C-alpha cells in the first residue's frame, strides 16, 4: 500500500488555491417588514389556533430562470430560514393585526455567478408553542411565488404580495462578497496596480486605480503589480508587461512593427493586448478604452460590465398590481409600467392612499377596500361619490296642512297652527306659552292667536295699559313680563293720541268692509245662547266651550255648544262670526 506524502508547503499552497474557490460569490438578502391581514381581503383570525401562542418563521428559496417553476423543485440557488422571530401573542379567535418584524432579515449565500433572472419563493411557517400544542409542530401558513430580475449591487427593491387573506411586505437585494465584483459577481478584484514603463511606439501606460482591498485570486505567481484577473486562475497583464505571469517588461528594441524583444533575445514579440482586443463586450455592446481599462456601451435591454446581464422586458411581467407594461421610450429603459389607479412606482409596487384625495363629496365617508373605492354617503345624498342631492320631501308629505321644508340633506315640517311634531301629527296648544300679558286670556283662531285683555289693557298681546281717569298711558310692559304682574307703564300723551287715531281709522275701515244688512250674513253664526258681545262679555261667552261630536262644519252650518264637564282641559278653537263685528257702537266701545 502506497501512501501519499504531502509536504506542509504543498498543503499550504493547495489550501491557498482552494480556499478562495469555496468563498461565496455573493449573498441574496430579503428583509421582511410586516405580515398580516390585507385590506379588502376579509378579516383573518390570529395565525395561532386555539391551542395557544405560536411563532412565525419565513423560508426563502431561490431558483434559477424566469419561468414559473414547480414549488417542489430544488432551490438550486440557495435557501435560508429566518431567525430571531418574536412570539405571536395575540389571543386565539381575535382579529389579527400586522406583525412587524424588526429583525426579519434572511440571507441566502450563492457560490456561482448571480444569474440576474430567478424565481423567488417565500413561505410563512407557523410553529405551535405551549404545553398543549399537540399535532404537527410546523404548519405552512402562506406561500408567495414570483419571477424577478435583479442585478447584484443595486439598491433595495420593495414589494408587496398577497396570498389568501394575508399580505406580506418585504424588500430584497443581491450583493457581491469580496473579492467578487460586478453585476453578476463573476469578476474578481484585480490586484493593486503600479506605474509601468512604456517604450516609444507602444500604447500609453496608465496605472489602474485600486478596485478593492481584497487579495487577488488570480493564477498562482501572477504579478501583483503588473497583472490582474477577472476569472479564477487567470493572469492578464497591464500595459508594458507581458508573459504568462506578467513579469516580462516590454522595452524599446530593434524589433519592427511595434514588436518587442522576446525572452533571452530569442525573437520579437507583439505588444501586450489592449483592453478592447477581441471586443469583451457581449450581446452587441461596443467597447471603448478608458485610462488603460475599457467600458462597454450596452444595447437596450442589457447591462453589466460586459453587457452580460439581460435587462427586464415586458415578457417578464415586471409590472405589479395590474400595471400595463409597454416598451420604454428611453434607450436606457427596457420597459415602462403604467400603473392602475391606486398604485405608483417604477413597477407599480407602491399603494397610494386614494382617500387622501377626498373623492367623496358632500361629507361622504371614504372607504378604501383595496380592490375598489367606496363612499358612504350622508342622509339625503347618493351616487358613487355622493354627488346627487336627493329630494328629501319627495314622497313624504306633512300631515294636517303642514309644509315640507328641505335643506342641508335633511327635511322638516312647518306645521299649521295647533299641530306639532316631526310630521305635524301631534296636537299642540298654542296658548301653552301664555302669550297674553297682564292677565289676558288666550284663544286659538284659524289665523293666529287671539288675546282677550283684562279691563284697562289693550293691544295684540294686551301689552298696552290705559288708565280709566284719562291720565297719560304707559308704554308696553317689557318682554318677559308675566300676565299676573301688576306693574304698569304710561304712554306719553302724544303717543296715546296717535295710537287712538290709528285704531279709529282701522275700525272705520273694518266697518265699511264688514257691515252687512239682515239676511246677508254668510259667515259662521253666533253661538246659540250668547248675548250681544261687548268689550267684557265676549270673551266670557266664548270661554270654555266645546263642539259636540257629530256637529256639522262649513260656514253656514249651525253648531250646538255645551259647557264641558269639570276637569276637562282641552283647548278650544273658535272661529268668530262676522256678525260679531257688525255693530259700530261695539267697535267704538272696544277701541275707546
UniProtKB/Swiss-Prot annotation:
Q: Where are the disulfide bridges?
A: 218-229, 222-235, 237-246, 276-287, 281-296, 298-307, 314-325, 319-337, 339-348, 355-366, 360-375, 377-386, 393-404, 398-413, 415-424, 431-442, 436-451, 453-462
**Cross-referenced PROSITE patterns:** EGF_1, EGF_2, EGF_3
Where does the UniProt annotation locate this protein?
A: Membrane
Q: Indicate what this protein is called per its UniProt record.
A: Delta-like protein 3
Assembly mode: Can bind and activate Notch-1 or another Notch receptor.
| Transmembrane parts of this sequence | 491-511
Q: Which residues form the EGF-like domain?
A: 214-247, 272-308, 310-349, 351-387, 389-425, 427-463
Topological domain spans for side Extracellular: 33-490
User: What role does this protein play?
Assistant: Inhibits primary neurogenesis. May be required to divert neurons along a specific differentiation pathway. Plays a role in the formation of somite boundaries during segmentation of the paraxial mesoderm.
Q: Which gene encodes it?
A: Dll3
What is the scientific name of the source organism?
A: Mus musculus (Mouse)
Q: Does the keyword Signal apply?
A: yes
Q: Which domain of life is it from?
A: Eukaryota
Amino acid at each position: 500500500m502506497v501512501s501519499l506524502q504531502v509536504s506542509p508547503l504543498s498543503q499550504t499552497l493547495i489550501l491557498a488555491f482552494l480556499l478562495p474557490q469555496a468563498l461565496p460569490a455573493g449573498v441574496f438578502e430579503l428583509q421582511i417588514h410586516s405580515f398580516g391581514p390585507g385590506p379588502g381581503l376579509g378579516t383573518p383570525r390570529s395565525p395561532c389556533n386555539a391551542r395557544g401562542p405560536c411563532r412565525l418563521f419565513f423560508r426563502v428559496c431561490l431558483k434559477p430562470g424566469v419561468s414559473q417553476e414547480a414549488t417542489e423543485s430544488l432551490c438550486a440557488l440557495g435557501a435560508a430560514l429566518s431567525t430571531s422571530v418574536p412570539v405571536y401573542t395575540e389571543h386565539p379567535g381575535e382579529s389579527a393585526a400586522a406583525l412587524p418584524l424588526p429583525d426579519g432579515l434572511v440571507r441566502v449565500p450563492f457560490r456561482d455567478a448571480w444569474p440576474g433572472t430567478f424565481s423567488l419563493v417565500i413561505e410563512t411557517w407557523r410553529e405551535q408553542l405551549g404545553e398543549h400544542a399537540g399535532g404537527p409542530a410546523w404548519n405552512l401558513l402562506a406561500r408567495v411565488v414570483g419571477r424577478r430580475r435583479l442585478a447584484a449591487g443595486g439598491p433595495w427593491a420593495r414589494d408587496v404580495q398577497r396570498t389568501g387573506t394575508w399580505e406580506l411586505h418585504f424588500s430584497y437585494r443581491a450583493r457581491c462578497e469580496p473579492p467578487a465584483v460586478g453585476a453578476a459577481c463573476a469578476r474578481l478584484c484585480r490586484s493593486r496596480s503600479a506605474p509601468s514603463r512604456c517604450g516609444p511606439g507602444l500604447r500609453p501606460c496608465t496605472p489602474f486605480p485600486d478596485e478593492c482591498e481584497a487579495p487577488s485570486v488570480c493564477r498562482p505567481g501572477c504579478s501583483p503589480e503588473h497583472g490582474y484577473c477577472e476569472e479564477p486562475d487567470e493572469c492578464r497583464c497591464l500595459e508594458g508587461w507581458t508573459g504568462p505571469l506578467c513579469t516580462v517588461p516590454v522595452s524599446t528594441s530593434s524589433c519592427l512593427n511595434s514588436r518587442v524583444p522576446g525572452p533571452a533575445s530569442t525573437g520579437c514579440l507583439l505588444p501586450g493586448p489592449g483592453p478592447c482586443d477581441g471586443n469583451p463586450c457581449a450581446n452587441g455592446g461596443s467597447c471603448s478604452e478608458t485610462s488603460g481599462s475599457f467600458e462597454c456601451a450596452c444595447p437596450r435591454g442589457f447591462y453589466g460590465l460586459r453587457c452580460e446581464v439581460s435587462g427586464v422586458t415586458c415578457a417578464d411581467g415586471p409590472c405589479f398590481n395590474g400595471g400595463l407594461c409597454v416598451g420604454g421610450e428611453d434607450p436606457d429603459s427596457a420597459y415602462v409600467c403604467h400603473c392602475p389607479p391606486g398604485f405608483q412606482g417604477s413597477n407599480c409596487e407602491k399603494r397610494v392612499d386614494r382617500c387622501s384625495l377626498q373623492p367623496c363629496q358632500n361629507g361622504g365617508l371614504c372607504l378604501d377596500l383595496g380592490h375598489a373605492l367606496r363612499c358612504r354617503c350622508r342622509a339625503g345624498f347618493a351616487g358613487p361619490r355622493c354627488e346627487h342631492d336627493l329630494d328629501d320631501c319627495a314622497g313624504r308629505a306633512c300631515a294636517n296642512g303642514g309644509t315640507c321644508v328641505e335643506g342641508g340633506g335633511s327635511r322638516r315640517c312647518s306645521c299649521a297652527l295647533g299641530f306639532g311634531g316631526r310630521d305635524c301629527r301631534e296636537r299642540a296648544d298654542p296658548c301653552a306659552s301664555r302669550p297674553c300679558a297682564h292677565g289676558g286670556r288666550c284663544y286659538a283662531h284659524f289665523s293666529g292667536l287671539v288675546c282677550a285683555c283684562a279691563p284697562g289693557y289693550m293691544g295684540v298681546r294686551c301689552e298696552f295699559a290705559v288708565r280709566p281717569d284719562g291720565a297719560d298711558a304707559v308704554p308696553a310692559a317689557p318682554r318677559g313680563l308675566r300676565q299676573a304682574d301688576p306693574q304698569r307703564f304710561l304712554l306719553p300723551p302724544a303717543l296715546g293720541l296717535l295710537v287712538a287715531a290709528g285704531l279709529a281709522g282701522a275700525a272705520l275701515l273694518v266697518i265699511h268692509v264688514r257691515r252687512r244688512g239682515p239676511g246677508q250674513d254668510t259667515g259662521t253664526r253666533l253661538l246659540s245662547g250668547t248675548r250681544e258681545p261687548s268689550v267684557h262679555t265676549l270673551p266670557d261667552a266664548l270661554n270654555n266651550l266645546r263642539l259636540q261630536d257629530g256637529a256639522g262644519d262649513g260656514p253656514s252650518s249651525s253648531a250646538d255648544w255645551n259647557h264641558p264637564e269639570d276637569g276637562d282641559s282641552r283647548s278650544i278653537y273658535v272661529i268668530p262670526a262676522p256678525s260679531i263685528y257688525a255693530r259700530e257702537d261695539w267697535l267704538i266701545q272696544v277701541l275707546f
